[in-house]
Amino acid sequence: MPSPAQDSAATMAGKNGHSLISTEKFRQLYHTLIASQLLNEQLRSAGKPAAIPHREAGPAGFVLDLRPEDIVLLPSPTHFAHRVKGTPLKPILAQPATASKTTLTRRLADAVAVSLNNKIEKNNAIVLTLFDLGGNAEASLSAYDEIFAIAVANQLPILFVLDSRASFADSLEFKETHAALPYITVDAYDIVAVYRVAQESIVRTRGGGGPALIELASCGGGEENPVDKMHRYLGTKGLPANKWRSEATRRFAKELQAACHLQSDPLA
């Protein structure tokens, strides 16, 4: 039986008034999602390390409102979420096709080290680390029990975000082992749901509530284009989805053109 800490996404989304999202924030979310998907496609077409198609909503929704001092640890230097955090396109596109990926063990250990330093310095910064288990249903979160135990024991300001493309074999056992670690599941293709969970999780962790693990899961009907999903949602709210989509596409095309021009300019 889940502990009270292992809350549902729906419950988390309704706390502390974060269920209300302004029209401007909806626009920003949609623009960010579209640009993330376009960048992901650009990276794949260039033969560079890229995220799995249609998995952009989770990282984008979590990273969007992080503060400059917050640290994001991503699988590769070409991950689209670097742009969401504020990295310009040029250095992302300039990464070689052989850009190395950090191992999961190293990334989780780095998250613990950085967040421990944040806690010691009392700088109010948090660490977000995005990881997956390689789409392998036999993969085990329990292989990293020690890292999660350290994070919980020290109430470290870390958000562990698991991009879960397949159910993993020991999820119930993991939750029982780490009963004090909030474990939240949210639809990986729904950026609005992700954003709401992100806001609650960030506020809780930044306020001294300790770490949390959020699973970006395929809920319900399986894989779906998150841009199309949000487009339909905006339509139900009477918001100008077509206009915003055109704006976002044009803006990213202009940004990409400028970045590519800078790359080809030896004086840039």
Task: List each language-model region with its residue ranges.
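Phosphate-binding glycine-rich loops and adjacent basic patches that engage nucleotide phosphates
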Residues: 2-8, 21-32, 104-111, 141-147, ...
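A generic structural signal for short, non-catalytic loop/turn and secondary-structure boundary residues
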Residues: 26-28, 65-67, 153, 207-209
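Short charge-dense sequence patches
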Residues: 8-22, 131-137, 151, 155-162, ...
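Conserved acidic/glycine
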Residues: 1-57, 127-128, 138, 217-268
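Thiamine diphosphate
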Residues: 157-255, 267
